[in-house]
Amino acid sequence: VEPGDDIARLDLARLPAVTQVESTRFVPVTFRHGHRSERSLIRGYDGRAVLYRVVDAENHATTLEGMGLVITDRLADKLGMRVGDTLLAEVEEGRPRSVALTVGATVREMMGLNAYMDREALNRALGDGDLSSGYVLAVERGREEGLLEAIKSLPRVAGAFSKATMLRNMQEISARNVRIMSTILTLFASVI
């Protein structure tokens, strides 16, 4: 998704049922440190995000504000990095450029080679204005469906989803899979 001016956040905040909006920016990069490299994505969130936070394996939230680049312990190991080291991030969107970023912290997550940064600091490091590529919304309970329909009709919206709907769908799929497996195991048991 091409990033755009963050002014769209104000338009989203005015939609009915929206109680809070946080901007995000995802930037595809190749990290380089010495002879090691790894393709990844820098996930730029509001420094003091509430709706979408970086949470470690022990369920502790990490504040991004003033931290520089925050990477997972697995990405740090793969690149041979420690806190305080500087790596090169080759940006793979927009105009070609490379930026040196200092690792401010590592976070232990269950999976992934992830990298995070305060969105405003990320934009400054890239020499960009106030850009965003996505938004996280808090919505009044029970009004999600109407809002999703309204959002899908907006220009430049690539997709919209509800966490509650996704969770409900996953639960339905899991329940169906349990029923199928129970039926199969019952058939096997009756044959034996």
Where are these regions (language model features)?
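Hydrophobic alpha-helical transmembrane segments of multi-pass inner-membrane transport and secretion
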Residues: A175-I192
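Secondary-structure transition/capping motifs at alpha-helix termini
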Residues: L15-T19, M81, E93-S98, L154-A158
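Residues embedded in well-ordered beta-strands within globular domains across many folds
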Residues: E22-R25, L88, V136, G159-F161
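Juxtamembrane segments of multi-pass membrane proteins
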Residues: V1-G66, V70-R74, R82-D85, N169, ...
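A short glycine-leucine-enriched loop at secondary-structure breakpoints
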Residues: K78-R82, L126-G129, I173
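Juxtamembrane "pre-transmembrane" interface segments
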Residues: A158-I180
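Hydrophobic secondary-structure segments that place a key small or acidic residue at a functional site
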Residues: R25, A61-L122
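Small-residue transmembrane helix packing/gating motifs
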Residues: R53, T63-L64, T106-P155, G159, ...
